[in-house]
Amino acid sequence: MESLEDDMLSDWLDNPIAYGAFEEDKLIGFVEGFLEEWNNRYRISNICVFDSGLRSKGAGTALLEKIMEDADKSGARMAVLETQSYNSKAISFYKKNGFEIIGFDRYAYSNNGPEEHNIRIEMGKKLFRG
């Protein structure tokens, strides 16, 4: 994993962190996150392995583990992320990595809501403090 620096991220987030997964010199995926100070939760705002042929080979897990290290170091009480209800592979991936469903938004993506079979799912993982 390598740290990614991008002025664009800095413009819209306070202290964003991003990491890239590389195969040789090619970026194959990335993850970004930041601490939501107002509620002390660490928001994983994006995680992606670009090529579907490279998924389920460990890059996504490595990216998630890396950003979770930062989430833990941040002192946040919980790590949170969102996915879409039709993305069963992502939901399974997050559950396998200790996340649970903590909320829904029927109208996040469309005013037609559930009729379009696309509900926003909020998932979270408690970060334990000693």
Regions found by a protein language model. Name each.
Residues 1-18:
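Active-site rim helix/loop that mediates acceptor-substrate recognition in acyltransferases
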Residues 35-37, 109:
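A short acidic/small-residue loop/turn micro-motif
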Residues 49, 56-69, 92-96:
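Conserved acetyl-CoA-binding loop-helix of GNAT-fold acetyltransferases
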Residues 40-52:
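Conserved acetyl-CoA binding element of GNAT-fold acetyltransferases
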Residues 77, 84-87, 97-100, 107-130:
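C-terminal "cap" of GNAT-fold acetyltransferases
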Residues 1-4, 22, 120, 129-130:
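Short amphipathic alpha-helix that is part of the acyltransferase structural core
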Residues 20, 26-35, 43:
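Conserved beta-strand in the GNAT
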Residues 39, 88-89:
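Short alpha-helical
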